[in-house]
Amino acid sequence: LAAVNEEKLRDFGDPEIATRIAQYELAYRMQASVPELTDLSDEPESTFAEYGPGSRRKGSYAYNCIMARRLCERDVRFVQLFHMGWDQHKTLPKQIKGQCSDTDQPTAALIADLKRRGMLEDTLVVWGGEFGRTVYSQGTLTKTNYGRDHHPRCFSIFMAGARVQPGMTYGATDDHCYNVTENPVHVHDLHATMLHLLGIDHERLTFK
């Protein structure tokens, strides 16, 4: 296929053919790099100990955190991790323990790992979701079973790396965590901050 494309490029000199050749080559390089990327046999035991239980299990959050670091090492520009199942309208006491166990250690390990390798200055880590949960319970309240409802009025995210000022909090809620009372942040403000940290002027991307 490459030989045919090169022949057509010589015959017609069409820049779109050259672009298509480059796309095919990039796609091949990306696919060819996957086996090496996903082979964790070169990781020392200390890596798995740092990222915690489950870090050897493919598809687990801890495993994916290691994969995220390996992708960043290979200059992948954007990496997104998911951890599902936070919609706890009931059985929250049981579920939240498992989810925190899944995410706390690997998340901290990923940030520490990036910093130790000198990569955190050039990497922006953003942790968040699409909304928060109510501070009050939902459903029948017992010691072992209750839930929390959707709460889009206020919630928290955190950012690390990319010259983010560490240890700083911004914004506040009322005593019931129901409404924002200080320094509300619109999603556009969040986007502007993220773009600024990446060296991009957000106003050049803003259109009415």
Language model features: what each stretch is:
Residues 1-208:
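Ligand-binding pockets and gating/stacking loops
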